[in-house]
Amino acid sequence: METILGMTAIAVALLIGMGALGTAIGFGLLGGKFLEGAARQPEMAPMLQVKMFIVAGLLDAVTMIGVGIALFMLFTNPLGAML
């Protein structure tokens, strides 16, 4: 039982940690490309900004789904019934 709980804790930590890391990298790339595009064509900046916020929302949604799955694994522990 302790092995399953330990592995579940490791899986939750990896899921949340890698999700946060991926989101941070994604936001960095997204912001950099937005600034590059706005500097290259300033008249397109409002349209690019709207698209950037849509993609940023989708990027956050993926991380929140991962956090939800991690909390499900942590509190309900579907693997505990295997014992």
UniProtKB/Swiss-Prot annotation:
Subcellular location: Cell inner membrane
Major localisation: membrane
GO-annotated cellular components: plasma membrane; proton-transporting ATP synthase complex; proton-transporting two-sector ATPase complex, proton-transporting domain
InterPro entries: ATP_synth_csu_bac/chlpt, ATP_synth_F0_csu, ATP_synth_F0_csu_DDCD_BS, ATP_synth_F0_csu_sf, ATPase_proteolipid_c-like_dom, F/V-ATP_Csub_sf
Gene Ontology BP terms: proton motive force-driven ATP synthesis
A UniProt-annotated Pfam family: ATP-synt_C
UniProt-annotated site: Reversibly protonated during proton transport, residues: D60
Keywords, sorted A to Z: ATP synthesis, Cell inner membrane, Cell membrane, CF(0), Hydrogen ion transport, Ion transport, Lipid-binding, Membrane, Transmembrane, Transmembrane helix, Transport
A GO molecular-function annotation: proton-transporting ATP synthase activity, rotational mechanism
Superkingdom, taxonomy of origin: Bacteria
Spans traversing the lipid bilayer: 10-30, 52-72
Topology in membrane: Multi-pass membrane protein
NCBIfam families membership: ATP_synt_c (TIGR01260), PRK06876.1 (NF005363)
Described purpose of this protein according to its UniProt entry: F(1)F(0) ATP synthase produces ATP from ADP in the presence of a proton or sodium gradient. F-type ATPases consist of two structural domains, F(1) containing the extramembraneous catalytic core and F(0) containing the membrane proton channel, linked together by a central stalk and a peripheral stalk. During catalysis, ATP synthesis in the catalytic domain of F(1) is coupled via a rotary mechanism of the central stalk subunits to proton translocation.
Subunit structure: F-type ATPases have 2 components, F(1) - the catalytic core - and F(0) - the membrane proton channel. F(1) has five subunits: alpha(3), beta(3), gamma(1), delta(1), epsilon(1). F(0) has three main subunits: a(1), b(2) and c(10-14). The alpha and beta chains form an alternating ring which encloses part of the gamma chain. F(1) is attached to F(0) by a central stalk formed by the gamma and epsilon chains, while a peripheral stalk is formed by the delta and b chains.
Family stated for the protein in its record: Belongs to the ATPase C chain family.
Protein name, entry field: ATP synthase subunit c
Gene: atpE
